[in-house]
């Protein structure tokens, strides 16, 4: 037994790693870092093992407002997060060289083996996260996986101790991982570049934001940078996986009412797709039509989930029914969420307007019905009386009454008598015709 134990220890020492029985638990994250007014810039590089292609990724967040995470070859739209990330493209290039050219093949082999040990084999992330603040700086080296769009992160954080300018490994962040510590040792020569880049980004942040405002406003005059919308109602559905969610909510802002569709979960900013449909009235039918989203994009939360979102203005569409479709582009699965009904105030207004129109219609209908019923009653009365005194006497009575009440009807009565009572002299004499 003792010999076997010694042999196991020697074998473990040669391999350089003791694999734990289970993977480290997922950490809760350091969300307070963003809320404390820090800027975060996350830069990732990974190889798609199916295609063999190297891909780069970046995301930025300021003051708890997550802006955007995009690929290296993504189209740079007019979003501040994208603008900030791709202004730092040199960091992408250096991380690419560092992770896949500088790091020894033995260390990468251990990292890949560690990933396979935890059941991840589809894609492998290696991420460097730079966190900037006045009193604290940190770099997090992460290894992530996107199998089935579920978050599986093995991460070790290193914080800079300001008192003696030394690095401290936070082993309790998500558990000790010797492979990542070894990989970090090889990356340590690059940390000063990352810190200087981080400090420089903080200094020019306000300048970049001002430049973004000028550029964005020149392309979109309706862009509202400081609006604070209020949510009215929301509906959501979970995807087949527990960590994916599709929601559709109705908002009210200064520029009117609008709807926001969000597809959230780990990895959906790259593998997720959303579409918004509106029911449009035609001449004889209703048809569902794809709505062009005025503002759309994907952004990555550094401490929570990825989110793909789209926004439409409801004031520009006549239809009352909308739904959002969230699709996993890799598997083809989708979820459909219907937009909630209109807000209470607008519903009350529409109800009041409808009630007023309905009351007017009811009064008009009652008056028409009364007139019709009166006419029917008169006709029935005339027919009933004619059975006893004869039709000639009734008509005679009507003509005499009209002639006495409205003398100006003489010409009309003369014509009627000539047509219906030719030769009846008694009627002519009585009417003085």
Curated annotation (Swiss-Prot):
Annotated localization: Host endoplasmic reticulum membrane; Host lysosome membrane
Membrane topology: Single-pass membrane protein; Single-pass type I membrane protein
The entry's keywords: Glycoprotein, Host endoplasmic reticulum, Host lysosome, Host membrane, Host-virus interaction, Inhibition of host innate immune response by virus, Membrane, Transmembrane, Transmembrane helix, Viral immunoevasion
Transmembrane segments: 371-391
Coiled-coil annotated spans: none
Organism domain of life: Viruses
GO BP terms in the entry: symbiont-mediated suppression of host innate immune response
Glycosylation sites: 145, 164
Cytoplasmic side: 392-433
Entry's Gene Ontology cellular component terms: host cell endoplasmic reticulum membrane; host cell lysosomal membrane; membrane
Known role: Plays a role in escape from immune detection by associating with and diverting properly folded class I MHC molecules to an endolysosomal compartment, effectively removing them from the cell surface. In consequence, surface class I molecules are down-regulated and infected cells are masked for immune recognition by cytotoxic T lymphocytes.
Entry's free-text remark on domains: The ER-lumenal domain associates with class I MHC molecules and is responsible for lysosomal sorting.
Family: Belongs to the herpesviridae U21 family.
Protein name, entry field: U21 glycoprotein
Organism encoding this protein: Human herpesvirus 6B (strain Z29)
Gene: U21
């Amino acid at each position: 037994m003792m010999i076997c134990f010694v042999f196991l220890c020697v074998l473990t020492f040669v391999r350089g790693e003791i694999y734990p029985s289970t993977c480290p638990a997922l950490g809760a994250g350091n969300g307070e870092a963003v809320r404390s007014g820090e800027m975060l810039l996350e830069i990732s590089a990974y190889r798609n093992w199916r295609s063999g292609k190297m891909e780069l990724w970046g995301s930025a967040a300021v003051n708890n407002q997550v802006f955007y995470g995009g690929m290296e070859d993504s189209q740079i739209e007019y979003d501040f997060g994208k603008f900030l990330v791709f202004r730092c493209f040199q960091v992408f290039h250096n991380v690419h060289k560092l992770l896949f050219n500088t790091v020894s093949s033995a260390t990468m082999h251990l990292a890949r083996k560690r990933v396979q040990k935890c059941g991840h084999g589809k894609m492998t992330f290696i991420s460097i996260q730079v966190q900037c603040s006045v009193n604290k700086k940190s770099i997090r080296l992460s290894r992530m996986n996107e199998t089935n769009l579920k978050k599986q992160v093995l991460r070790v954080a290193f914080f800079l101790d300001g008192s003696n300018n030394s690095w401290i490994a936070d082993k309790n962040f998500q558990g000790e991982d010797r492979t990542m510590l070894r990989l970090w040792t090889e990356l340590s020569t690059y940390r000063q570049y990352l810190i200087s880049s981080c400090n420089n980004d903080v200094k020019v942040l306000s300048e970049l934001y001002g430049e973004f405002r000028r550029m964005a406003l020149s392309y979109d005059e309706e862009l509202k940078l400081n609006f604070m919308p209020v949510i009215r109602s929301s509906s959501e559905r979970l995807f087949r996986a527990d960590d994916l969610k599709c929601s559709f909510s109705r908002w009210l802002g200064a520029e009117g009412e609008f709807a926001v569709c969000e597809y959230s979960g780990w990895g959906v900013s790259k593998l997720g797709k959303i579409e918004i449909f509106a029911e449009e009235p035609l001449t004889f039918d209703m048809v569902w039509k794809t709505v062009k989203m005025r503002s759309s994009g994907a952004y990555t939360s550094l401490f929570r989930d990825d989110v793909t979102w789209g926004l439409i203005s409801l004031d520009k569409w006549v239809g009352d029914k909308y739904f959002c479709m969230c699709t996993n582009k890799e598997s083809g699965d989708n979820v459909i969420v219907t937009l909630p009904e209109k807000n209470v105030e607008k519903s009350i207004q529409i109800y009041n307007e409808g009630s007023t129109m309905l009351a007017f219609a009811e009064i008009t209908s009652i008056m028409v019905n009364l007139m019709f019923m009166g006419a029917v009653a008169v006709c029935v009365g005339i027919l009933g009386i004619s059975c006893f005194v004869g039709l000639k006497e009734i008509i005679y009575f009507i003509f005499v009454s009209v002639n006495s009440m409205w003398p100006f009807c003489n010409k009309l009565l003369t014509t009627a008598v000539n047509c219906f009572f030719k030769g009846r002299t008694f009627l002519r004499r009585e009417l003085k015709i």
